[in-house]
């Protein structure tokens, strides 16, 4: 019985389609992983420029469903076909694999004003379901770096999408290259129920 504040079709599309989110990020200058455009034909011309390792994921699934890590062409082709088989959308994301800690960053929005609410570290539990996280905590030594490097561009993403009221969040990785990259956004309360 939680409210849905999404009054913009664009906001809903960006929050539920990872490809549209990435396009909007690129438009406003928010950092995202390098990606590769592939079609179901998986032609030699498409595959020859891919630099491994990559991540393959459907644009319309959450909780890491359909996501695969690929070190070579054979793994990429199999992962692409798998992601395509479980997706309702013909677009599949193939992007550079990022390595580093993951964060969920929550914002509160009121009358178009956007404020960072909390910055939480996510630690997945090896050996458990792929969409299971064991620990989420709000204290992080990386908050200042995030604010300095990414916070303003995330606010631009929300504004450009038409997010004006409610709660929104982004998931991000601090890659081993020392920079944050945005993964996806939500325009709703998060599933981990940290608002309770």
Where are these regions (language model features)?
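Rossmann-like NAD(P)H-binding beta-loop-alpha module
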Residues: 26-117
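Electropositive phosphate-/nucleotide-binding environments in soluble metabolic enzymes
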Residues: 70-73, 144-151
């Amino acid at each position: 019985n939680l409210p849905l504040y999404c009054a913009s079709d664009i906001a809903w599309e960006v929050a539920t389609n990872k490809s549209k989110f990435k396009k909007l990020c690129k438009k406003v200058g928010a950092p995202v992983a390098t990606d590769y455009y592939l079609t179901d034909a998986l032609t030699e011309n498409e595959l020859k420029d891919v630099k491994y390792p990559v991540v393959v994921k459907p644009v319309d699934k959450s909780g890491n469903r359909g996501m695969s890590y690929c070190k070579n062409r054979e793994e990429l082709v199999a992962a692409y076909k798998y992601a395509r088989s479980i997706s309702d959308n013909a677009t599949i994301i193939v992007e550079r694999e990022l390595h580093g800690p993951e964060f969920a960053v929550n914002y509160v929005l009121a009358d178009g004003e956007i404020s960072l609410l909390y910055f939480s570290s996510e630690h997945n539990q090896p050996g458990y379901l792929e969409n299971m996280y064991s620990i989420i905590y709000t204290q992080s030594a990386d908050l200042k770096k995030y604010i300095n490097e990414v916070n303003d561009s995330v606010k631009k993403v929300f504004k450009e999408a038409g997010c004006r009221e409610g709660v929104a969040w982004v998931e991000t990785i601090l890659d081993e290259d020392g920079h944050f990259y945005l993964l996806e956004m939500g325009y709703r309360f998060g599933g981990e129920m940290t608002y309770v």
